[in-house]
């Protein structure tokens, strides 16, 4: 629903059985944007059939890339963007079924390479 000033008064989208409502900043509804230049402490994670397409659409819509799409050791392909309001969004798709044993081994290798 458009706001009188041309902004977004109300928008919603459905992810599985979860409905998410968003709007532009509006003091009368206690909807405040974060101070410019900051990033929210939360991360919205969206499972999708096509991580790369979701990432590309977000970038074209004005999001900033924080991590380009890449395969992760736990079997997902994921990317992270920051929207113009400072919120981070992760797009993920399952690309490989990883056994618990392989996951433990890969996690050990991943975290040992970070020290």
Regions of interest found by a model, annotated:
Residues 1-49, 53-82, 92-115:
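Vicinal oxygen chelate
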Residues 85:
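C-terminal catalytic core of tyrosine-transesterase DNA break-rejoin enzymes
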């Amino acid at each position: 629903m458009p706001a009188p000033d041309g902004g977004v008064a109300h928008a919603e989208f459905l992810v599985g059985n979860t409905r998410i409502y968003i709007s532009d900043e509006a003091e009368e509804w206690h909807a405040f944007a974060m101070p410019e230049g900051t990033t929210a402490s939360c991360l919205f994670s969206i499972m999708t059939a096509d991580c790369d397409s979701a990432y590309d659409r977000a970038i074209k819509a004005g999001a900033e890339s924080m991590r380009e799409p890449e395969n992760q050791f736990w079997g997902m392909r994921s990317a992270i963007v920051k929207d113009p309001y400072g919120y981070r969004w992760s797009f993920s798709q399952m690309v490989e079924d990883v056994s618990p044993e392989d996951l433990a081994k890969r996690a050990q290798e991943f975290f040992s390479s970070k020290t």
